Amino acid sequence: MVYDNIKREIIGMLKRMPNKQADWDNDLLPTLKAMFNPKSVSNAKSQLISEGVISQEIVDGKKIITLIKDPYELQAPNVFDEEMFLAYYTDKLKEYFKHKLSTEGPEWDIFDVKEFIMHFPESGDLNDKLIEHPYEVRKSITNVYIEAYEELFNETPNVEFIHIRNPIDCRISLSELSSAHKGKLVEFRAMILQATKLKLRYAKGFYYCPKCGATKTLDLGFWDKPKEVGKSLTCPADGCDCKGLIFDEDLSGKVDFQEIKVQTPLQESIYANKHSTTVFYEFNKPKKAVYSGYVKIVGVPIVKENKNGSVGELYIHAFYIEKDDEDIEEIAKNLNEKDLELINRIAKDKNVIQKLSDYAFREVTGYDMIKRAVLLQLVSSGTNIDMRTSIHILMISDPGVGKSTLMESLIQKFPFVKKVYAVTSSGPGLVGSVVREKAEFGDSWVLKAGVLTEADGGVVCIDEFSRNKEVYDYLLGVMEQQKIEINKAGVIDAVLPARVAILAACNPRFGRFNPDLTVWEQINLPKELLDRFDLIFVIKDKIDKKKDEDIADFSIDNYNSKVRERKGKSSGKKFVINGVELNDELLLKYVLYARQIEPEISDEARKIIKEYYVSVRKMSEAKGTFGISARQLGSIIRLAVAHAKLRLSEVVKAVDAEEAIRLVDTCLKQIAYDPESGSIDIDKIAGTPKSKRDKVEKVLNIIKEISNSRDDGLAPEEEIYERAERAGLSEKEVEDAINYLKRVGDIYSPKSGYWQLMS
C-alpha cells in the first residue's frame, strides 16, 4: 500500500497524544520529516483525511489533527506475525547488526531502537510492535543478530537474547506502573536500594524424549522449574505418544541474573509518593553487576501468580539497565521560560545570596554567615568533575541554639537532603553493607546501599555527630574520595558513588562551652576527621539582652504566622527579591538551576586566592606556627566556585574569592587562632598550637633530665616546678603542661608528688 508506513506512523503518533489530537506543524511534522520524505508525508496525510481516518481543522491559526479511527487495528487482531516481521525487517536488522559488530566488536549485544530508526526512518512501526509484543519481537531480533554474527565471524555467539535499549514513547513513572502494563515494554527511571550478587537460571530448556530421542526447546520463565515443566510436555515426534520429557542441563541455555530492589527517584518523588518494585536483570555473558545509583530500566512488567491462582505481585523483567545519574538535575533542565525569567531576575539582585539564605532559613534567627555557607553547600555536591567539589560543614555549639532547626528546614525544602542521627546510626548503615537474606529466588548475598550512597549528589545532615565514634572511620574516605568501596571476598566487589556534602552538628566535649577553656580544648573529634571539613563554626549561647529580646519576638512572630496560615489567613510577610515573590518551589528550582553551572576561575579571583594563601603561610612561618595547608586552599576554591554558582555566573570573580576567604578566615580564627603567637595555627585544631607545644616540650625535657639523674627514675614535682620557673615558665603553664602530658599518656604518677616517664 502506498505510503503505508507513513500512515501507520501518523496514526501511531496520534494514538499516543492526549485525546488522540495534535498540532500538525509542531507536534507531528518535525518528527515525520526526519523519518520520511516531506512530500510523501504530505501525501500520506491527505490520503488519511480523504479516507476519513483523520480530520483537520484550523484552531487559533494551528492545524489540529484528530484521529477518528485506526483502520489497521480493525483489519488485524493484536497478534504478532513473525513471518511478516522478518520478511520486512531482516535485511535492515542484519545491516544494522553487522555495522555495530564491526565497529563495537564481537562482545556487543545491544539493539538500540532509537538509533535503528534513525538509520531506517521508514521502520518506525518496529517500535510499536516491540512495545506490544516485547518477547516475540526480541526473539526475532535475536535470531537475526545470531545470523549476522555467524556471517561476520563464522561462529555462533553465546547469547540467549539481545539487550534492548532506547525504545520510543513508552516512558512511564515508576509510580504509574500497574497491571495495565503487564506484558508491554516500558521504560522508567529508578534509584537502586539493594541488589543481589549474580545468580544463575535456565532461560531456555532443552528436552528430549526418553522413548524416541526427539528433542524440544522451550523458553523458561523466572518461576518455571525446568524438571517439572518437562513432566507436562509431550513428545513432538509424529507417532510417539510419550508424555514427560527429560530436561538436559548441559544443553539448556543458562544466564546470569540479579534481583534488584528499586525505588522512585528523587526527581519524581518530590510531588508524589515513593514506590518500589523488584527487577530481574539478566546477562548473556559475565558482566559487572549493577549495585547502586540512579538507573534507566527498559523491561516488561510480569506477574507471579499465587498458589491459589490469584494475581500476585508485579515484577519487572529488565531487557536493559543503564546508569542515569542526572535525576533531580533534570528539573533544572526542564524549567519553562517563565521559571527561567524569574530565576534570572532574582540572580540580578546584588545581595541575592544573603536574601536567598534569609528566606531558605527563615525559621532560624541570626547566624547569617552560617546560613550563607549552608546555601553554598547545597549547590556544591553532585558534579561530574573528577575532583571533590562538595563542601563539608561542621557546627559545634551549645545546646538549643537552633542547629537542629536549621537542618530540619533544609529537609523540608530540598528533597536531595537527608538527615541521620549519629547516635542511632552505624558505619555500615551510612556506607552500605553486604548481608545474606531471603530474596525471591532463595537466600542470597545482598548489597544494601547506605545513606551516603542513597544521597549521592545531595547533602547528608548528621546530628549529634560526636556521640558515635564508630562512624568516624567510615566517613574519612567518603568525605575526601566521594565514593565507597565494598568488597566481600568472592561475593560482591563494588564501587558505589557517594558525591555528598556533609553538614554535621555536635555539642562541645563537656556538653556546653566552658569559658575557662579554649575552644580547641573542647572539640571531641579526631584531627584527621576535622581536617575533612571545609568550615567549622563555633556557636556559643551568650547572654545578650538585645539578642535575647529579638529571639523572643522572632519565636512569637513565627508561631503567630503558622497559626494564621493554618486558619487560611495571610501571614502578612512576603519575601521579594528584585520584584519576584519567593516561594519554596521557586527556591528549589533556583538552587537546582545553580547546581548545574560549572564556572571557571578568573585571573582576578586566582590572584586574590593565591595572595591570601601565600601571605598566611609566610606570616605563620615567621612566627614559627603552621598557618594553612593545601586543604584550606581547596576549601577556598570550592566555596568560591559555589558562590559564583549561586550568582548564576559562569565565571568565579573577585567577589566570590573574597567571600570564600572571609568564610574560611572567620572559621580559622574561631578555632585555630593562637593568641600567644598572634597568628593562625591549624595544628591547634584538635591538636596543640606551637606556643603550647614549646612549653609542653620544655616540661617534658625537664622531667626526663630529673628522671635520668635519679636511681628510682622519679621526678619530684617540686623540682620540676623549680627548674621550669628558671626556664621562664609560670606555675600555671607548668601545671597545664603536666596535665596535658598525663592526659596523652607520656607521664604518670606512681605516688603522690612524683612523676615518671611511660616506658
Curated annotation (Swiss-Prot):
One Gene Ontology cellular component annotation held by this UniProt entry: MCM complex
InterPro entries, sorted: AAA+_ATPase (IPR003593), MCM (IPR031327), MCM_CS (IPR018525), MCM_dom (IPR001208), MCM_lid (IPR041562), MCM_OB (IPR033762), MCM_WH (IPR048907), NA-bd_OB-fold (IPR012340)
Keywords on record: ATP-binding, Cell cycle, DNA replication, DNA-binding, Nucleotide-binding, Transcription, Transcription regulation
Binding site for ATP: S397, D398, P399, G400, V401, G402, K403, S404
Residues annotated as domain MCM: 352-556
Family: Belongs to the MCM family.
Record protein name field: Uncharacterized MCM-type protein MJ0363
Organism expressing this protein natively: Methanocaldococcus jannaschii (strain ATCC 43067 / DSM 2661 / JAL-1 / JCM 10045 / NBRC 100440) (Methanococcus jannaschii)
